[in-house]
Regions:
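Nucleotide-activated donor-binding/catalytic signature segment of Leloir-type glycosyltransferases, i.e.
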Residues: 230-248
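Membrane-proximal helix-turn-helix segments that form the acceptor-binding/catalytic region
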Residues: 112, 134-151
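N-terminal subdomain of nucleotide-sugar transferases
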Residues: 1-51, 210, 363
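Short hydrophobic beta-strand element within catalytic cores of glycosyltransferases
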Residues: 285-289
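Glycosyltransferase donor-sugar binding loop
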Residues: 216-231, 246
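Conserved acidic donor-binding segment of nucleotide-sugar-dependent glycosyltransferases
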Residues: 300-311, 319-325
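Aromatic "clamp/platform" in nucleotide-sugar-dependent glycosyltransferases that forms part
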Residues: 268
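Conserved donor-binding/catalytic core segment of Leloir-type glycosyltransferases
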Residues: 2, 183-200, 204-212, 218-220
Length: 363
């Protein structure tokens, strides 16, 4: 089986340790999926990336990299270059994650050329036919739904949204990672990790740190296109017990989760945060202001969701810091949850099974 995995734009930092380009969870997930496909004997995988340099890259032997187009190319130029690459490769399936106009056009293209298009939703907003960052309606979304062979969602909310609003069925496959044999949690500080975005509400973590001078806080917040980043950084620097970090290379970010006592999420909404996976795989309990996909924090007792209340978030932070038995219980459950639900090897096998079943049905 020949599979082409398309990495989202801004993925160059995953292939160059010196790059300061900011990327998100969708980039990491497609990188992990492509890497694991490369280890599967039954799959001939090609990883399609933008036309940029791939230097200082330790895992080159695990990828068959194919350069396609520049991010600055017009959409029809992208399509022409992409068309030529796909005609050379002749894949059985194409995987893509993260909603863009290109996604919808690609679904139509694959339908015309008899290629199974597998679309993976990156956030809850996408399942409602809206772009993740802007919230604007994706006008060509129905083209994607009508022509994609397989839709993969991250949680039951996304699956239900697609079914109720658009009559399309999907398959839940959660984010995956290469997991550890035992938890690494060391419990040194309270951690927040996300790019600068109004949806992530970073100012609330700064507020939390300022209210708790007895503990050390670390905030990894790379800049983005969102305004007022310098103002945020200056505000953070005024809080003595808060360390504000502008950038951490992809290969080093796991160390921050290993040493964290608690991970805090202040986002308005997300699909399944990549950071939840990074926290749980290290046995780090989670405090979330609002985000709780499939009620996993409460259902699996791996943290607390505070239903939008900063006061409750404060109370739960105090509780986790003062109750050693509760903390150890949640830490162990967090690690066990990741082992059962987020093994990239198991997830990739599920994707292969879906594509194989679809191919058999198609023929």
């Amino acid at each position: 089986m020949k599979i082409a995995v398309i990495l989202p734009s801004r993925s160059e930092a995953l292939f160059d340790k010196t790059s300061k380009v900011i990327f998100g969870g969708a980039n990491v997930q497609m990188y992990q999926i492509a890497k694991e496909f490369g280890q599967c004997d039954e799959v001939d995988c090609y990883t399609l990336i933008g036309d940029y340099e791939t230097t200082n890259f330790d895992e080159r032997d695990k990828f068959n990299l194919i350069k396609t187009f520049r991010d600055t190319d017009r959409i029809f130029v992208k399509f022409w270059k992409f068309h030529k690459k796909l005609q050379q490769l002749k894949p059985d399936a194409v995987l893509q994650r993260g909603l863009t106009a290109f996604s919808s056009l690609l679904a139509v293209y694959c339908k015309i050329y008899g290629i199974s298009f597998v679309y993976m939703f990156a956030s809850d907003t996408e399942a409602g036919g809206r772009y993740q960052e802007s919230g604007k309606r994706a006008r060509l979304f129905k083209w994607l739904l009508a022509n994609a062979r397989i839709l993969i969602t991250q949680n039951t909310y996304q699956k239900g949204m697609l079914s109720k609003q658009f009559g399309r069925e999907s398959h839940i496959i959660r984010s995956g990672f290469y997991l550890k044999d035992e938890p690494q949690n060391q419990g040194d500080y309270v951690l927040w990790v996300a790019r600068h975005s109004h949806l992530k509400r970073p100012e609330l973590f700064i507020e939390l740190a300022s209210q708790n001078p007895q503990w050390h806080f670390k905030m990894v917040c790379p800049p983005s296109l969102a305004p007022n980043y310098d103002d945020l950084a200056q505000k953070a620097k005024k809080v003595k017990n808060l360390e504000f970090i502008k950038f951490v290379p992809f290969g080093n970010i796991d160390e921050y989760f290993e040493k964290a006592k608690v991970f805090v999420n202040t986002s308005d909404y997300e699909g399944f945060p990549q950071t939840f996976l990074q926290a749980t795989m290290n046995g780090t309990p989670i405090l979330s202001l609002l985000v709780n996909p499939d009620s996993l924090l409460t259902e699996h007792q791996i943290g607390f969701c505070c239903n939008g209340s900063m006061q409750l978030l404060q109370e739960k932070l105090v509780l986790l810091s003062s109750d050693a038995d509760l903390y150890q219980t949640m830490s162990k459950k967090a690690f066990n949850y990741a082992q059962l639900n987020h093994d990239i090897k198991k997830n990739v096998k599920k994707i292969i099974s879906l594509i194989s079943a679809n191919s058999a049905h198609k023929h």
